[in-house]
From Swiss-Prot:
Protein name from the UniProt record: Protoasukamycin 4-monooxygenase
Keywords: Antibiotic biosynthesis, FAD, Flavoprotein, FMN, Monooxygenase, NAD, Oxidoreductase
Metabolic or biological pathway, per its Swiss-Prot or TrEMBL entry: Antibiotic biosynthesis
GO molecular function ontology, one term from the record: monooxygenase activity
Broad enzyme group: oxidoreductase
Subunit structure: Does not interact with AsuE2, suggesting a possible transient interaction between the two enzymes instead of formation of a stable complex.
Null mutant phenotype: Mutant does not produce asukamycin and accumulates protoasukamycin.
Signal peptide range in chain numbering: none
Regulation: When flavin concentration is low, activity is enhanced by the presence of the NADH-dependent flavin reductase AsuE2. In the presence of abundant flavin, activity of AsuE1 is not affected by AsuE2.
Highest taxon of the lineage: Bacteria
One of the GO biological process terms: antibiotic biosynthetic process
Length: 407
């Protein structure tokens, strides 16, 4: 159900989800399918279009969760399978693994999918739920809560037409802040992020695939330089280059041709290919990276989910993976709390998920390939945390309502 009926200026529901990305939509969908009434409120007038956005890597456990939601066919049709990682150092191969090598993984590949495609697939499923209401063009501006419920106040966003009420109140048993790093709902409940910025930027270029290469994530680490090549739909590749400090200014000024020249020593085949397809690449984009945490994942009846409460380096696509898995954990906790009347399940959401997410953050923060260290790499960039990404602790699997630690 989707509505902008001005008569609905006051709503009561089991769960109110604030946000409009894949994390918010997925959490709302799980709650609705579990039998709860759900109101999702997005501050923007429109959701991201299918095919739009970046194409992060969805890991096998996340794909298993999304497949159970009925959107597997859409994701597979629009996405690109990634079979594993080959990681090269200055003296040769540091590590090589495939998802299929990890015993028990039901789905032996990751999938890079445009974020807009995931959003639209989840949105269609959510709108089909009889107890779900989707509202757009309204920003959260107030929150009040007691032991029984939380009341959220919304205002019509600038530029919205009169079909949306100027103000609206939604009373819910629980609320979910899934509105991203700049979360308005998180700010309203008084939670501030603790941000740690990586001191090393990188530069992104999207180009057609080098012919004949296997669909794996390639890492070439020639300290302090590092090159990451990620298969994306197209077929194309996202080329992420972290140069030495003294190469950065030249890269800012030189664009794709300069990037191709700089990587010649690290990946001569790709360098030559970029020269061949120079008119078919994207512009070069500078990327900055950071991690962020929050001192608490919950304030009373408001739960913080996804990038509203944690952020990771883009390496391996773990930001979206952990956000979607967090939405599943939160939805399960809310369902148990509503069914039993016992808020202990809400406390378990943070207790079980938080150590897993922060372990990934710590591994990324200390990863040699993401810094300016000049010592030759002795381990693959993904080697230390492939198991953390794919083999989930049993208690976390139970919270996700899965049946296998390597779903």
């Amino acid at each position: 159900m989707t509505t902008s009926d001005p008569d609905l200026s006051g709503l009561e529901t089991d769960v109110c989800v604030v946000g409009g990305g894949a994390t918010a939509l997925y959490g709302a969908l799980l709650c609705a399918r579990a039998g709860q009434s759900v109101v999702l409120v997005f501050s923007q007038p429109e959701f991201e279009a299918a095919g739009a956005g970046i194409s992060p890597l969805l890991a096998p456990p996340t794909l298993g969760l999304l497949a159970a939601s009925g959107i597997d066919e859409q994701l597979t049709a629009a996405g690109r399978k990634v079979l594993g990682v080959d990681d090269h150092g200055s003296t040769g191969m540091l590590s090589s693994w495939r998802y299929a090598d990890h015993a028990g993984i039901a789905r032996p590949y990751g999938l890079t999918v445009p974020t807009g495609t995931t959003v639209q697939a989840l949105l269609a499923e959510l709108r089909a739920q009889p107890r779900a209401t989707v509202l757009t063009g309204e920003g959260v501006v107030s929150v009040e809560q007691d032991d029984e419920r939380v009341v959220l106040g919304f205002e019509r966003a600038a530029g919205q037409d009169g079909g949306v009420p100027a103000r609206r109140r939604v009373a819910a048993r629980y609320a979910v802040a899934a509105d991203g790093r700049q979360s308005a709902l998180r700010d309203l409940v008084g939670i501030r992020l603790e941000v740690s910025a990586f001191d090393r930027p990188a530069w992104l270029l999207v180009a057609p695939d080098v012919p004949g290469r296997e669909s794996v994530l390639l890492v070439r680490h020639r300290a302090p330089r590092a090159l990451f090549t990620i298969p994306t739909p197209g077929p194309s590749s996202a080329v992420v280059w972290a140069p030495d400090r003294d190469q950065e200014k030249q890269l800012e000024q030189g664009g794709p041709a300069e990037l191709a020249e700089q990587i010649k020593e690290v990946d001569p085949e790709l360098s030559e290919w970029l020269g061949t397809v120079g008119g078919r690449t994207s512009p070069v984009m500078r990327l900055g990276f950071s991690l962020w945490r929050a001192p608490s994942w919950r304030v009373g009846r408001v739960l913080l989910v996804g990038e509203s409460v944690h952020g990771l380096h883009t390496l391996g696509g773990q930001g979206l993976n952990q956000s979607l898995q967090g939405a599943a954990s939160a939805a399960r906790a809310i369902g148990e709390a509503l069914a039993s009347g016992d808020p202990a399940a809400i406390e378990d959401y943070e207790r079980v998920r938080r150590p897993h997410v922060e372990r990934l953050q710590d591994l990324q923060w200390n990863l040699q390939a993401l810094g300016y260290g000049t010592a030759p790499a002795v381990k693959g960039a993904h080697e230390d945390f492939i198991d953390v990404m794919t083999a989930l602790p049993p208690e976390l699997v139970a919270q996700l309502d899965g049946s296998d630690t390597r779903a």
